[in-house]
Amino acid sequence: MRRILFIILSSALFFIGNIHAQVATSDSLVMHYLQQQGIPVTANNEVKLLMSGREKFLDLFEEIRHAKHHIHLEYFNFRNDSIANALFDLLAVKVQEGVEVRALFDAFGNWSNNKPLKKHHLKAIRDRGIEIVKFDPITFPWINHAMHRDHRKIVVIDGKIGYTGGMNIADYYITGRPKIGQWHDMHMRIEGDAVRYLQGIFLTMWNQETKQHVGGPVYFPDIPQLPDSIAEEIAIVDRTPRETPR
């Protein structure tokens, strides 16, 4: 029996599913769609599901501490709270160690949450050597491209470890919210060939928004072959804000 982890990175939604196909043939709706769209399935991956905010942030922060070359982050929003502050503190330490740090966030996602990053927050972050860029700034009084925002949640560390899932950067994924209670969401850590696709998605958006030309082999290192006993197949479907048809 073949298992494919089918990940959609959408500007409108995030969906993750485990698909257990009875027969792994082109008759499978999933395989047919992937083939039709020319979306590759990578087989050399190890996946760890992170079933709570606490699991996600403990795992993410630990891997950031071990980063050697670069850390790339792309989120709908970084809520200006204790988790985000701890994250930026840690990222600033890594900058001092010589690690490149780049972060993208959606302008509407930032504006629409109740603890946004304001101009003075962004200046303080940049003053610490962290490159942070706003995707598609809002043009008041209009909310431009309201249905085509960047809802991705991606982290790539040294081109080898990737994170994606349902959680932005906010402390309520751990503490809950007064009117809602405990927050239930999930995330995942990926090691393997699929990380190259997450990296490509991030760098395409980064270069588009900054007019930089970040790229090259150092961001796409060779990935060791994993034992068949732990290797998972992953397909990543990306919907680019303002570009990909519905």
Q: Which ranges hold each PLM region?
A:
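Bacterial Sec-dependent N-terminal signal peptides
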Residues: 1-26
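Charged, low-complexity intrinsically disordered terminal segments
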Residues: 18-246
